[in-house]
Structure formats: C-alpha cells, structure tokens
Amino acid sequence: MQNRHIPAAAFMSTKTKLRAVAVGGTADEVEAAFYEALQRGDLDALMACWADEDEVFCVHPGGPRLVGAEAIRAAFEHMFANGAIHAMPVRVRRVESLASAVHNVLERIEVLTAEGPRRAFVLATNVYHKTAQGWRMVAHHASPGSVHAPDDEDDAAPQTLH
C-alpha cells in the first residue's frame, strides 16, 4: 500500500487557510504576522493570529478589557476605519516555556496629526499559547503612549518574579 501525502491546505476552509498563512511555527512568527497585519490594516490577517478561544482578551491604551474574538475584531475594525496602525516593535523581551510565551514589547507608534506626523512609545504585553492549531495570541495588553521611550537602566538588574 502506497502512502500518499495530501496537503492539509486542500482540506482547509478560507479562515483556516488565513490562519495557516499568518501563523508560523513559533510565537515570534505569530508576533511578526500580528504587527505586519497592523501596518497593512489587514483585519483578517490580524485575527488569524488570535486563538480560537472564548477567553482571549485585548486591552488597548486607555481602553476597556475586550473579551472574545468578536469584541477584539470589532475594536480593530473600528481602529482600521481610520487607516492602518503604524506600530513597530522596537524591543522585545521574551519569556517562553513549552506551551506558552510572553513577549514584553516596546512599540513605536507613528500617527498623523493636524500638526504633522507624531511618534509615541507604547509598552505592550503579548501572550501566546501553543494550541492544536499552532501558536496563537491569547492576550494583548498595551499601555497608554508616551512621547519618550522608557530608559533601559533596569536591563542589567536581576529580575524578580513575584
């Protein structure tokens, strides 16, 4: 008996295909896809990064806690109505284990205002879990912006978990 390999893509729905394209083999690849989708204003690609779970959550700077993919999608759809979000990861600190990863990200955000382009810095925490579908984002929490990047004086100090 001959064993034939049939590509999984042949059996996938459009939504699953989008997830497969957006989500790679590592949490880093999911994060890269997330920020690329923000910069393109691509809602489907952005949502493909999220886990298909009821309790995923997102907190935008100064905003409420959004729970569930539907609430998260609606918030990003509203944000994308004003154009893509020019958020670039400047620095990422990672804590990873077998099935979860936490990325603390310093984001540089560029926005156009009536006075011209402005830059702000946001601290975000992105949490990823390894699911049956691969690595997926389960939480995104972003701080209010600041015109100054936080200094890195504490980088050399030992970190204590509590």
Label each region the model flagged.
Residues 2-48, 56-162:
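A beta-strand edge to alpha-helix "cap/lid" segment located at domain peripheries
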Residues 51:
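Helix-to-beta-strand junctions that scaffold the AdoMet/dcAdoMet cofactor pocket
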